[in-house]
């Protein structure tokens, strides 16, 4: 909810002023998307819960708020944020795997890149294209995310749906680890692939498919 303009009571859509969840108001231009609320979305989400549910006894708004807080990223250095087994820690697992294990995640890399561009993040991480962002996926997972989701992954093994999420997550990691080619290699590979398909049109379709497959396997093995 922290990304939604108008979610917090003090948000003023007409003036383009939005509560940052910490008692301050931030201005977002008409041309700015909800992505500009990224730095504040966790605090805004907590504020939303307190504003809407503090008066309802059946909702433990403090617990919900602590779960939202644990999804803050980068992760705070405070010791309590190291816990990965409690409910807030598992909420972080759900948040991370829900994003990185999304079946369409790798197709959304371009949108994520332009979100980062709007926020000025790309310059800070020296990322110049969606391809470079995709290239860093596996490193980001193993170097940053894995230690926070390991316990949650074990729990997901209990159900079939959970196993499917794990499978998609590992599939994304594997794809980014093993199918990354530099631009020169990509150019050379596609040059020879075009040659293979041009050759098949000359040879004929009756026996060209096995030949194409064999040549493509040789090309990929040579990379």
Predicted regions located by residue number:
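Post-HEXXH active-site segment of zinc metalloproteases
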Residues: 7-32
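An active-site-proximal "capping" alpha-helix that borders the catalytic cofactor pocket
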Residues: 37-55
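A generic short-segment signal for beta-strand/edge and adjacent turn/coil regions
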Residues: 35-36, 59-62
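Divalent metal-dependent phosphate-bond-processing catalytic cores, especially two-metal-ion Mg2+/Mn2+ enzymes
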Residues: 3-14, 51-58, 69-223
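A cyclin-like helical interaction fold
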Residues: 45, 61-68
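Contiguous, well-ordered alpha-helical segments that form the cores/surfaces of helical PPI scaffolds
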Residues: 1-3, 47, 66
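Alpha-helical context
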Residues: 21-29, 44, 73, 88
């Amino acid at each position: 909810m922290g990304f939604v303009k108008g979610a917090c009571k003090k948000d003023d859509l007409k003036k383009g002023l939005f509560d940052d969840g910490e008692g301050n108001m931030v201005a977002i231009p008409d041309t700015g998307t909800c992505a500009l609320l990224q730095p504040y979305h966790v605090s805004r989400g907590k504020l939303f819960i307190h504003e809407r549910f503090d008066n309802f006894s059946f909702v433990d708004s403090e617990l919900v708020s602590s779960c939202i807080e644990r999804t803050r990223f980068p992760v705070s250095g405070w010791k309590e944020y190291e816990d990965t087994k409690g409910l807030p820690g598992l909420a972080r697992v759900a948040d991370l795997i829900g994003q990185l294990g999304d079946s369409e995640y790798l197709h959304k890399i371009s949108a994520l890149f332009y979100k980062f561009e709007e926020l000025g993040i790309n310059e800070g991480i020296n990322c110049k294209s969606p391809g470079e962002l995709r290239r860093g996926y596996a490193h980001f997972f193993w170097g940053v995310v894995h230690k926070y989701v390991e316990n949650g992954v074990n729990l997901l093994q209990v159900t079939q749906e959970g196993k499917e999420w794990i499978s998609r997550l590992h599939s994304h990691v594997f794809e980014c680890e093993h199918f990354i080619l530099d631009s020169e290699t990509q150019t050379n590979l596609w040059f020879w692939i075009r040659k293979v398909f041009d050759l098949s049109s000359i040879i004929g379709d009756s026996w060209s498919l096995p030949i194409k497959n064999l040549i493509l396997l040789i090309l990929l093995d040579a990379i």
